[in-house]
Amino acid sequence: MSTAPRHFLDLFDVPTTELRAILDASVAMKKRRKEGRIADKPLDGKTLAMIFDKPSTRTRVSFDVGMRQLGGEAIMLTGAEMQLGRGETIADTARVLSRFVDIIMIRILSHDALTELAAHATVPVINGLTRRSHPCQVMADVMTFEEHRGPIKGRTVAWTGDDNNVLASWAHAADRFSFNLNVATPPELAPNKLLKDWIRSSGASIKLGTNPEAAARGADCIVTDTWVSMGDKDGEHRHNLLKPYQVNAKLMSLAKPDALFMHCLPAHRGDEVTDEVIDGPQSVVFDEAENRMHAQKGILAWCLGAAG
């Protein structure tokens, strides 16, 4: 009797003990790599299918290289090539790919398409990004925080900007890893009803507000993201609403003296963050970028039941 595949779709789907095991494996694999111990190939002979409906440099390279470092291989498929959901049904695509590959990563705007793919796949499916959430990114962020500042449990993270997929996964992480999350957004760009309802039901230590200074005060880390994503309309209007939410030296000064600055990149310098902050000593954005690969290696190994 075959067991159900171990998907990685959202942080709240995975028990805290399992998320911690993934991070521990990710840290160990990174350490071995830095020490030149590269003989371990736990995914030797395994193939990852990467499906991209939304373009990405970091997601593609980090999954591709990470899979190769684990001894496997990766193939890339684009939405244009696959006509995902427009030609063959998503369910049939999931069934067919499951016969060819060992694991699937999909980066697609529609979260419903992700869950439908996972429902019909007989191999693990990883959420590489949807409009609703970005769990791989926030696993890398938690890994990065703990590299620099130790356990994140009980610490305070401030989010300043708008409601988006990265914020949602930070909220899920606050619940799973037991840290405080202060959120500051313009009233017009506040967290959506689905996320607010989830926050309310989760009991997580999350404060929603509109004042970036209040959110940042005493924080251990300040996080932001680009104000206008691909496909967003009314970019100029959003930009005007978000100007007061820029992360600059003044805002960073309200956080703890050793507070970190995080951004998942690419950054629009001069908009959501100043050069002074993103290039400054508190910024760990390039560590985050590197840790995308290491965290995803941990996720790949976990999904496939392989030792990291």
Curated annotation (Swiss-Prot):
Gene3D superfamilies: Aspartate/ornithine carbamoyltransferase. GO terms for cellular component: cytoplasm. Carbamoyl phosphate binds at S56, T57, R58, T59, Q83, R107, H134, P135, C136, Q137, C264, L265, R292. Keywords: Amino-acid biosynthesis, Arginine biosynthesis, Cytoplasm, Transferase. It is an enzyme of class 2 (transferase). It is found in: Cytoplasm. PROSITE patterns: CARBAMOYLTRANSFERASE. One of its GO terms (molecular function) is amino acid binding. It holds the Pfam family OTCace_N. One of its GO terms (biological process) is L-arginine biosynthetic process. Pathway: Amino-acid biosynthesis; L-arginine biosynthesis; L-arginine from L-ornithine and carbamoyl phosphate: step 1/3. Its main location: cytoplasm. Its EC number is 2.1.3.3. It catalyses: carbamoyl phosphate + L-ornithine = L-citrulline + phosphate + H(+). L-ornithine binds at N165, D225, S229, M230. Belongs to the aspartate/ornithine carbamoyltransferase superfamily. OTCase family. Reversibly catalyzes the transfer of the carbamoyl group from carbamoyl phosphate (CP) to the N(epsilon) atom of ornithine (ORN) to produce L-citrulline. This is Ornithine carbamoyltransferase. It comes from Nitrobacter hamburgensis (strain DSM 10229 / NCIMB 13809 / X14).
